[in-house]
Amino acid sequence: MWAFRTARIGSLLAATSVILRRCLRLGVAMAKSKFEYVRNFEVQDTCLPHCWVVVRLDGRNFHRFAEEHNFAKPNDSRALHLMTKCAQTVMEELEDIVIAYGQSDEYSFVFRKKSNWFKRRASKFMTLVASQFASSYVFYWRDYFEDQPLRYPPGFDGRVVLYPSNQTLKDYLSWRQADCHINNLYNTVFWALIQQSGLTPVQAQQRLKGTLTADKNEILFSEFHINYNNEPHMYRKGTVLVWQKVEEVRTQEVRLPAEMEGEKKAVARTRTRVVALNCDLIGDAFWKEHPEILAEEN
Ligand SMILES: Nc1nc2c(ncn2[C@@H]2O[C@H](COP(=O)(O)OP(=O)(O)OP(=O)(O)O)[C@@H](O)[C@H]2O)c(=O)[nH]1
Ligand SMILES: [Mg+2]
Ligand SMILES: [Mg+2]
């Protein structure tokens, strides 16, 4: 009797599991349409593991954008501060960015070596950075350009570059900062010759043809009494964004006995914030001061 019952339960269970399996198969077949195969056309764009992932953005045709929006020449501090505000937003909204560097119409964002954000898909990194940056540029425009309406929507191109070692990453950032220095020195003399000496752009270009750094410094000093080293750091060095612990003091209402109700007290707390620096990245000093950026766990 007992054996008969056990056999019956067994065959019932077997029948149920066959039905269940059929249903599941049918369900899966139904969920997959005949068009499903097009998924296979998607390319794998996973960034190589253990590499620094750098996303660099650059303003599209900003030569024209700067003209149309009356940017000051050679440097418009409103435009540079707006770029930095957008980059700060990118760092705060997205994940795993350990440092960013910007100058002119470009910003580079460095994702930590071991980031597994969106399974390290390059297209996700690039498009999320570019779209967050571009929407922030429009969103915050009025805060920096109070009297200058935004005349058309700006665009930013993006690229992803992988750097396999700390040295190559440091060299990449040094390259961008050296570019900032070379362009800024040239532009400072170029516009001084036009704005202060009345040369035409073609004449200014001719005057600077073949000149070396020392020559440009000399022209600035002897003709315009400008010591290039005293020009603002933001123009000469660009902007570095890093995470830093900042002590914040806020006045806060505290719970006290009824007779003291509503009293406020200063409360200090430490938060990690994105901080903008206009410092040198090429020498060792910066990396010694901020060892956590290249630390192994990154
Ligand atoms: N007047 C002024 N112009 C700026 C400033 N920052 C950037 N620009 C302009 O933006 C340009 C940026 O250079 P590029 O990125 O090489 O060139 P682009 O015109 O943006 O062209 P693509 O990047 O190739 O699309 C500079 O050459 C300037 O004309 C600024 O502070 N003041
Ligand atoms: Mg550009
Ligand atoms: Mg550029």
UniProtKB/Swiss-Prot annotation:
Signal peptide annotation: none
GO molecular function, one term: magnesium ion binding
EC number annotated for this UniProt entry: 2.7.7.79
Positions annotated to bind Mg(2+) 1: D58, G59, D105
Catalyzed chemical reaction(s): a 5'-end ribonucleotide-tRNA(His) + GTP + ATP + H2O = a 5'-end phospho-guanosine-ribonucleotide-tRNA(His) + AMP + 2 diphosphate + H(+)
A GO cellular component annotation in the UniProt record: transferase complex
Subcellular localization, as worded in the UniProt entry: Cytoplasm; Mitochondrion
Residues binding GTP, per UniProt: D58, G59, R60, N61, F62, H63, S104, D105
Principal place of residence: cytoplasm
Cystine residue pairs: none
PANTHER family recorded: TRNA(HIS) GUANYLYLTRANSFERASE-RELATED
Protein name (database record): Probable tRNA(His) guanylyltransferase
Protein species of origin: Mus musculus (Mouse)
